[in-house]
Amino acid sequence: MEYTTLGSTGMEVSRICLGCMSFGSSDWREWVLDEDESREIIERAIDLGINFFDTANMYSAGESERVLGDVLADYDRDSQVVATKGYFQMDESDPNSGGLSRKAIEQELQNSLDRLGMDTVDLYQIHRWDDQTPIEETLRALDDAVRRGDTRYVGASSMWARQFAAALHESERSDLERFVTMQNHYNLVYREEEREMLPLCADEGVGVIPWSPLARGYLTRPHEDVDATTRGENEEYLYEHPYREGGGPEINERVAELAAEKGVTMAQIALAWLLHKEWVDAPIVGTTSVEHLEDAVEALSISLSEGDMAYLEEPYEPVRVSGHE
């Protein structure tokens, strides 16, 4: 396993982050694994040297956090880097169980800690931007969470670059904890983040940990076969992203061509491309099988030339912004 410093924190994380959205309960999504199946993957991840785990309170309505915490309880907590997220409403009867008000952050972070069975997380992220709450209130609540010891660092997820810049400016102006990571939507068939967000993160020393590095599975198999997966058959959200627009199909075909040429999988080529991008610290890889996890880790050993990178990128065309919802 390779490790890297996460942004400007000084904290070392594995270059593959295990995404835990697929762990918890199939009552939430049909493709989600139960606890025993999830445990097998998490334990194998640790065997492979992965020390970085990302979950969220909304995944399986909290079950993902509980499952992750139960498995990690059998290991040395000091050797783990655990990240979770909050924003989306957790209880339909409680309007304060979502959003980024002080009340919501305090209660939902504590609920996450309770489910994880931990006193602190290493990284607490806002899952989206909250138009209803002043960013000053959100940042002060997060600053207090760091001072209380509930989290060591704070991060953010998909939003407009102008919003992220405003948050970083407010942290500096008011001497508050600043976001040290950006978990954004970024992969070979969705590169709109290269226009503003990624240069901003590079300038500010913010670590980048992209979600959906394999484009919800679109980059793991020929594009005409994507709909045949369990996720493809059951998740409408998959089709809300513009992967099939612009140059998506041709990029998919070039990934397949290069994978065949190098004797590796399409997923490994797509991950290797991300791992070769200087502004990416660790892509967040979700999986439902040990085999796919092992493939992802092997992507670290794949070398792509400048010509390979250019060949994969050349068909890309601008697409609609996606992932800020």
Language model: regions and residue ranges:
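Active-site mouth loops of central-metabolism enzymes
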Residues: F23-D36, D91-K103, H127-Q132
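Conserved beta-strand positions
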Residues: L18, T55, T84, L123-I126, ...
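Acidic (Asp/Glu)-rich catalytic clusters
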Residues: S8, V71-S79, L113-G117, V146, ...
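N-terminal binding-site loop/beta-alpha segment at the start of enzyme catalytic domains
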Residues: M1-Q80
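Short, acidic/polar
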Residues: V32-A45, L100-L116, F164-L168
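Structural motif corresponding to the early beta-alpha repeats
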Residues: Y75-L100
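Beta/alpha (TIM)-barrel catalytic core signal, keyed to glycine-rich beta->alpha loops juxtaposed to Asp/Glu
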Residues: D130-E314
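Active-site groove signature of glycoside hydrolases
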Residues: L113-Q132
